[in-house]
Amino acid sequence: MNKLLLTAFGFSTPKIINVAQKMIQENKITKACIISTSWPKEKEKHPQMQQIKRDLLSMNIQQVDFLDVEFEDANKLFDYDLIFLNGGYPFYLLHYIKKSGADQILKRINQNGELIFGLSAGSIILGPSIALMQYLYPEDNQFNDSNLDGLNLTDIHVYPHFKEMLTRDPTIKDKINKYENETGINITRLNNDQALAVNNDTQTLLD
């Protein structure tokens, strides 16, 4: 079973909220864990972390906790039936997901049919690779990691905040097109008001 929700900006539209709520209700989710590692300094104190916790609680999930796999035991993830990989720095997040062994744990959780939601960086690392991030933002690879393999829970390569990034860097469109032409890899561009729901082999764009 493969049940994922890949978002660019969390529960940003009524449609995304409705789909998330349906997934939560159908799977009888009572305990959720937000992985807070993606913000190196702020961790769970980051406003985005707190917003996601409020959102999940508003969906009638009884317990929502934070877990920082940089410092805490990743095996605690087995105690939850929904894992939320929050946004932040994809290189930093993936580095500690792998170092802590959370990568293998998340794969087992996914195989068991539990829900995994991603936001931005969290959505990126659920895919096959973060090589696009290395191509676009090599300066962010602070650990100089050469293994850029993602968790590979989906074959979707996500680039989040596409429309929003265009206003900051108009060249991003050409850069991603060039990457696709050079690698043959298709990049799914998600704007902040979009998400992808994955149910086994079915992928649904929410926009």
Language model: regions and residue ranges:
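Short acidic-glycine loop/turn motifs at beta-strand connectors
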Residues: 197-202, 207
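Short glycine-/acidic-enriched loop or helix-start segments at secondary-structure transitions
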Residues: 15-17, 44, 94-96, 126-129, ...
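Flexible gly/pro-rich beta->alpha loop and the following alpha-helix that scaffold active-site loops
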Residues: 65-114
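N-terminal beta1-alpha1 cap of cysteine-dependent amidohydrolase-like domains
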Residues: 1-82
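Conserved anion/nucleotide-ligand pocket segment
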Residues: 149-193, 199
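Class I SAM-dependent methyltransferase SAM-binding "motif I" and its flanking Rossmann-like core
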Residues: 95-96, 103-164
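Structural motif
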Residues: 5-6, 82-86, 117-118, 157-158
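Charged helix-capping and loop-helix junction motifs
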Residues: 47-51, 97-104, 172-173
